[in-house]
Amino acid sequence: MTKSKGIQSIKVSGRILRALTETERGMPLSQLARQTGMPPGQCHSYVTSLKKSRLVSQDVDTGAYTLGPFALELGVAWLKHDSLANETVNLAKRLANDTGFMSLVSIWTHKGPTIVHVSEAVQPMALNIRQGTTFSSINSATGAVFAAFGSEVIKQFVTRELRDHLQFRQPDRLRYEKSFWDYVEVVKNDGMAATEGRPIPGVNAISIPIMGTQGTLSFACTLVGSVTELKVGPREKHRLLMAQVNEEIDSWGTVA
């Protein structure tokens, strides 16, 4: 009986964690209880335990619940056992070693593009970029890759973030929105995204997609460097290098 109860507790906790993976801005207890089909009191007991294990966090201002830092740590641990993830991390390490620039691997989470691996630059830059950092989906090279190659759910997220960003730009909102999606089409055609001096002034980035076996976007691999050293023009050497890497990734074939 005790064993059965224990397993049931894991299942219920799993429902809570699943619900939190599907929210963008966190959930208040009442919504989380409805989403998981539990009375609020029972749901509160579970999230209290999950908070103690750092699987769940609670915003001190809003009271909303989100996935906690240990959830990310579990995800990173899983990545070590995934062959495509290993290939991607090894690629990032090689790019950092060959170019001297910082190289990042990001995945899509409920918060947007999120870094899961950082290969530091040969001469580290004073940037607040680390594992768990989330990029803007509309103002970064990594975000543009997810907007261009991601699923319909990702595109809906990007659309909401874009419209939130543009809500005070009437009457030019539609023009800005069209300009953004035109840029996304360019990214799709080029097979990569590049940004100059944004979102971080003085920093450039080039990002490429890593597609999984089903043809869906799994990761983005991003090279980050200063505007004076990492040139991102169409014929610049590091952009051409990333184009070569794109061809190499195609040759990976069906990585299990």
Predicted segments — roles?
Residues 19, 46, 87-98, 186, ...:
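Amphipathic alpha-helical regulatory segments at dimerization interfaces
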Residues 55, 115, 219-220:
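Short glycine-/small-residue motifs
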Residues 60, 108, 211-213:
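Short, acidic, Ser/Thr-enriched surface-loop or helix-capping motifs
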